[in-house]
Amino acid sequence: MEDGTAYYYDDNGNLYRIDDNLLPNTEYDINGYRYETDEEGRIVSAEGRLQVKDHEGRPAIKDSIEDIGKGDQKKTDDRGHLIGDQFNGSNGMENMIPQDSDINRKDYKALETELAKEVAAGKEVYVKVEPIYEGDSHRPVAVMVTYTIDGEESVRVFPNEREE
């Protein structure tokens, strides 16, 4: 922290965040995963070979939903991990989006559980998560997950809306 400003650096020593803002048009690596932001400083891609973390427990999420959503979040949103905590995904805004709590805790979690079983079975699992935005909103309308298990690719799209 210099002059009250917080600077955040990735695994390679590259600056990717200042205070509560991810830098625009930036690629950064956190815990072995590669992330990319767009011109608005929104995460547009998170990818890497999934690894199961080697410690128990879950650290507190570092950033508020307000900081992550920039005012575009909904009351029903969670701070959703792009790369799940069980895969050693970061617990900061560099790996988070405003995600509908029903989607986050049910369908998205079910996919993470399925992928964790594949990793535990010794399979090579690579994932690319791409939030899809409309306009300049920091809340994605959907999340596209492309995953490859031992060379076989699949795609799932999760609308970021609660089913009525």
Question: Which residue stretches match the model-derived regions?
Answer:
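Long, low-complexity, intrinsically disordered regions
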Residues: 1-20, 25-27
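Domain-level detector of nuclease and nuclease-like folds
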Residues: 22-164
